[in-house]
Amino acid sequence: MSSRNASIANERTDEARMFNFYEKMPKDTNTVRVFDRGEFYVAIGEDASFVAQNAYHTTSVLKHHNVSNTSYCNLSPSLFIKFAEDVLSNLAKRVEIWGANSAKTGFELLKQASPGNMQMLEDLLVSENYQESTAISDSSVSSVLLAVTTRVKQDQRIIGVAFIDPILKKLGVSEFVDSDAYTNFEALIVQVGAKECIISQSGHESTNGNSAVSINTAEINRLRNIIEGCGALVTTIRSSEFSARDVELELSKVLDSPVTHALVPELGLQLAMASCNALLRYLGPALLNPDMEDDRENTSRKLHLYHHNLEQYMRLDIAAVRSLNLLPPPNGNAHKTMSLYGLLNHCRTAMGARNLRRWIVQPLLDAKSIERRHDLVSALVEDAEARQLLLDDDHLLRSIPDIPKLCRRLTRGSASLEDVVRIYQMAKALPKIVTVLDSLTSEHKDLVDKVYTNVLNNHCKNLEKLIELVETTIDLEALDSHQYIIRAEFDEELLDLRQRLDELQHSIFEEHKRVGSDLHQDTEKKLHLEQHHLYGWCLRLTRTEAGCLRGRSSHYTELSTQKNGVYFTTKRLHSLNNSYMDHQKSYRYHQNGLAREVIKIAATYGPPLEAIGQVIAHLDVILSFAHASTVAVIPYVRPNIVDSSIAQEKHGQSSNILDIVSLEDTPNFEEIRRTLENNHCARLYLKQARHPCLEAQDDVKFIPNDVNLEHGSSELLIITGPNMGGKSTYIRQVGVITVMAQIGCPVPCEVADLDIIDAILARVGASDSQLKGISTFMAEMLETATILRAATPRSLIIIDELGRGTSTTDGFGLAWAITEHIVTQIGCFCLFATHYHEMTKLSEEITTVKNLHVTAYVGDSESKDVALLYNVCEGASDRSFGIHVAKLAHFPPKIIEMASNKAAELEAEDSGAQGDTQEVKSKKEGMAIVRDIMRQWRSNVKPEMTQQQMMDQFQKVIGSFAQQINSNNWLQSRVSTNEVSS
């Protein structure tokens, strides 16, 4: 057997072994497995189908193994990287790479990654998607990993949480009391953007000091349901991992400061520390920095621990995030205008885009912090020239790399000279950015200087030595040819090697000319000198011209014949090439050593670089707000934040717990929350409000409407009107505008007066959960119950079409009771869109309930054409438009006619229920008489009777009921003794 045949046979044997191995692997729907085959990857079975649908978007790529008939498909390395990033970032699944073991007798797990733990694939993903300045997408979201445990003691449910953001190098902990619906935990998942959550495999003992409290499996299942509902991946680990024992030792390995109870008060949060221990153990001893064990003194590699306070941000449940379209869907296929994030994302840096996403799910509660953001936005709105320079100049924000990810590469030891050059280019761009900011003439110039200009100026000075280092060591002229190399003049030995390489290259060029003269071939057009990836320096002639080599094998050695010509060399060129390759190898080796030293020095600039990244990310979002406000169909306006109740006199020092670390003072959030909870919202007034996403869509002319919610007069608005008339849009735009105002963005209104809202809770749309055994109605009730428990007097509740999943009477009764409870017991602002017109009667009983309706024009009685006007007016809707909407949807005329007739019949019955007319009453009595006649006749008829005898018997019964028949008008007009006898 030839070596080629043997190789093919071995490959087939290995392939069969791979398919057999896959069949025996345990199935996991949350994991995608691929096999590394060297030059490509292979997905098998269900994983192949998943790859075909999500990577290729077609099943035509599926093949079938000729022995097992199992489906499979191949992926190139570049396609696999894109696919893996999508799976980890958007599809909430794990990725495993399997390959042949060292003995080549089986397969082993080579690498694995999950949405919250990408460390094994991180370098691969970053290197493939390195152009951060242009790759601003949802894939730039931080892969936040969270661990959670809980205990119930004295009827209080306490949650302990720890989470890590590897990009920002932050380790957050939190411990709080929650309801049995886990509303606070859900809000925290939304706030931190957790992609993966670690829970116990089963109920476990949670340590709190010296006591242990049992946690039953039901609590674990509730946590799982909340996590999965938020779109995060659930990972289970042994319950014994959730222990606070030795947590100080574990933290000392990864934190950037000493770990003692005096310096780290978070150690007193026992449940949070138990979750923290589980988190650290899951990630492994070296955490996200593999070399940390060898460099414990390097604090730039370590994490910053902070206490995440739920009280600092508006609470948003996942239903509100989705129903208000605050973020794009996980698949990322939606148009930019389909979500608030997409609409506002004009960021020029990846870290700015991440910061924007964080701000949207973390609206502020402190009025001063909100006003500060609006001041900064106003400064850029007022100066169009400066704004456009920052947006469009390729040498300003567009030249800033993804600094957190770049710093992470530096600290991991996986950086390159290209990374150092990008830092250098950023350092050169900073003074230009400062110059533009310094040119602003706004009344808020002092604030701009405090937040941006002065800070960036200081950091520019810190980077002067780094700029000098790069200009001294790196060949900047070579950047034009995309080469990142050390300057030969920087090192004497390197310079000697460079000079020798230049001499060899000159000799090679001379040999090229000599061969051209010898073969009588033009060295510019026919005889080509090339650096081949296999042969190094060699010569090439087209196959047409290669005839001149025949009979001259003693002078010229043919290397190969290919489509583009014949490759050959000479003895001298071969010798020169070998010498060149040896010197080049020495040059690269020596240069790599110098490059490592340069990179190591650059890595020491981690802290100032990270601080610059925070400032630039903040500026990028503020700039994005200003740009979105000015390019909108109708420019946005600055809202007036009505500070009705928040006490702001006492402010603490900055403690790095805000997303804009050290850029804004940190208010006393506990005081703010207490004040919020004890006070009602004063007002939410929007004049000519518009939905920002809808008005930005093509071919949409949006009809603006006013919104007026005021404590003591109009706290709950009931909106009725035709389907497709704009009810849902009206109530959702209020939620979106509220979020925009509290993140510091101007809003799409003419005038906006808003008090601080502490939570937006939404119950919008029907959502069957049949896979979980939950019906539409049950889902409605569960969501509504959660809202009622979580709402405070300062919340905003948005309810759309509650009670459709059950009978009309039950649905109406529940809707009435729920609405009445909200307005009388909770007292918060609420927008309630409903198809139950009877709900409008609630305003007659409760003065703070107001009725609104969306208008429609109805034609004359013959045409009955309907035109939806989308205006929201005071008062209740006086009719239903369901059949008219069916006409707009082009239902068959026969169905429309049947629906109209049935509606008329039901209306008649309904009016009868309200108070029967004489005709309807006569009909009911007549029908009862007929039933009595038939009942008596049947009892008198015998089986042996003839037909005539039966008719005679019927006449007798009719005669006995003659008085009742004659006294009933409806029966008398339809039945007579003569008609019956005939």
From Swiss-Prot:
* Location (main, coarse): nucleus
* Record Pfam families: MutS_I, MutS_II, MutS_III, MutS_IV, MutS_V
Does the keyword Manganese belong to this entry? no
Listed GO molecular functions? ATP binding; ATP hydrolysis activity; ATP-dependent DNA damage sensor activity; double-strand/single-strand DNA junction binding; four-way junction DNA binding; mismatched DNA binding; Y-form DNA binding
Write the record's keywords in alphabetical order, separated by commas: ATP-binding, DNA damage, DNA repair, DNA-binding, Nucleotide-binding, Nucleus
Q: CDD domains of this UniProt entry?
A: ABC_MSH2_euk
- The organism sits in which domain of life? Eukaryota
Segments traversing the membrane: none
Disulfide cross-links: none
Q: Does the keyword Plastid apply?
A: no
One GO cellular component, as annotated: MutSalpha complex
Q: Tell me the InterPro entries matching this sequence.
A: DNA_mismatch_repair_Msh2 (IPR011184), DNA_mismatch_repair_MutS-lik_N (IPR007695), DNA_mismatch_repair_MutS_C (IPR000432), DNA_mismatch_repair_MutS_clamp (IPR007861), DNA_mismatch_repair_MutS_core (IPR007696), DNA_mismatch_repair_MutS_N (IPR016151), DNA_mismatch_repair_MutS_sf (IPR036187), DNA_mmatch_repair_MutS_con_dom (IPR007860)
Q: Where in the cell is it found?
A: Nucleus
Q: GO terms for biological process?
A: gene conversion at mating-type locus; maintenance of DNA repeat elements; mismatch repair; mitotic recombination
Task: Write out the residues that bind ATP.
Answer: 721-728
Question: Which chain positions lie within coiled-coil regions?
Answer: none
Q: How does it assemble?
A: Heterodimer of msh2 and msh6.
Similarity field: Belongs to the DNA mismatch repair MutS family.
- Role description: Involved in post-replicative DNA-mismatch repair. Binds to mismatch-containing DNA. Required for correct termination of copy synthesis during mating-type switching. Also required for proper chromosome organization during meiosis.
The protein's name is: DNA mismatch repair protein msh2
Q: Which organism is it from?
A: Schizosaccharomyces pombe (strain 972 / ATCC 24843)
